[in-house]
Amino acid sequence: MDHSVLNVLVCPICKANLYYDKENQVLVCKADKLAYPIRENIPVMLVEEAKKMTLEEVKKYG
C-alpha cells in the first residue's frame, strides 16, 4: 500500500484518520470501529464493505 495514499484517506463516515493494518490488509477507523478492506492494493472505502469491529479489536490499535 502506497503511504502517500494513506496520508489523504480518511473515514468516509466521520473523516477521522485511518490506521493501516498491513498484516490484515485493512484500514481501521477507531472512532467508528470499522475496518475497510484493501484488495489488490486498493482500499475499498465503501461503508457496506467495512467490517464492524468489537471494542477489544479496536483497542489493539492504541
UniProtKB/Swiss-Prot annotation:
Native organism taxonomy: Bacteria, Pseudomonadati, Pseudomonadota, Gammaproteobacteria, Thiotrichales
Name used for this protein in its record: UPF0434 protein FTL_1400
Pfam family, one: Trm112p
One Gene Ontology cellular component annotation held by this UniProt entry: cytosol
Protein's organism: Francisella tularensis subsp. holarctica (strain LVS)
Recorded family membership: Belongs to the UPF0434 family.
Cross-referenced InterPro entries: Trm112-like
Coiled-coil region: none
PANTHER family: PROTEIN PREY, MITOCHONDRIAL, ZGC:162634
